[in-house]
Amino acid sequence: FLLVSFLTYAQQDTHKRLFILLGQSNMSGRAPIENADTAALPLVKLLDADGRFEVARNPLNRFSNIRKGITMQKLGPGYHFAKTLSEQLQDTIYLVVNARGGTALERFMKKDPAGYYKKTLSRIKQALRAYPDMKPEAIIWHQGESNRDDYQNYLNHLNKLVTDLRTDLGIPDLPFIAGEIGKWNPDYSHIVKRIAAIPDSISYASLVSSEELTNIDEFHFDAKSQKILGERYAKKYLEISGIEVT
């Protein structure tokens, strides 16, 4: 049954699948890149700085046009997210990774003078120009630590950001998959509650748990947890898409 379900899906759905990975430092990646995660992923293509796709390898955020220093870019959830999806679907996965560490949600919004929204949208459109048959499948979002003290309007602002991206991409029902931030810091309690409410506050949104994940410092997941988080993002995408594989 599972094999039939997968074959039927593959036969019906032949467009190239693009995933948009956004957020702050845990999406950028701050965990050490271990030996097992240095391998290139032949079935995963990463948009480079010139608008072309290359075989993905860590650090995935190195081509972000809003990132901080290159030496800060390490292992995020995107590597194991894309690795898991490509293995499950036995198909090529395309990524735009455009994160920036230490950045509050409001800086990513369309009208913010920092211009991160415009720069991010330009990279997504570069990707879509590269392949006419490419379709954004989901926005993968991991952010919140920088809003730990400024959380009151978080859900309203995030809803506005997601709505703007969907409008500018012409996909009003584009799935939005958010991840919980780490739960080890009591200072996160208010923003953790806001993030938990995302599925009830934003249409076509879902949430990935950070339960039992561990950290390397005050803000960041360790390498083991980034692997688990990436796999959880992949599982959530498959779940909401109704794709049955293994």
What are these regions (language model features)?
Residues F1-T14:
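Bacterial Sec-dependent N-terminal signal peptides
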Residues Q11-T246:
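Cell-envelope and extracellular/periplasmic
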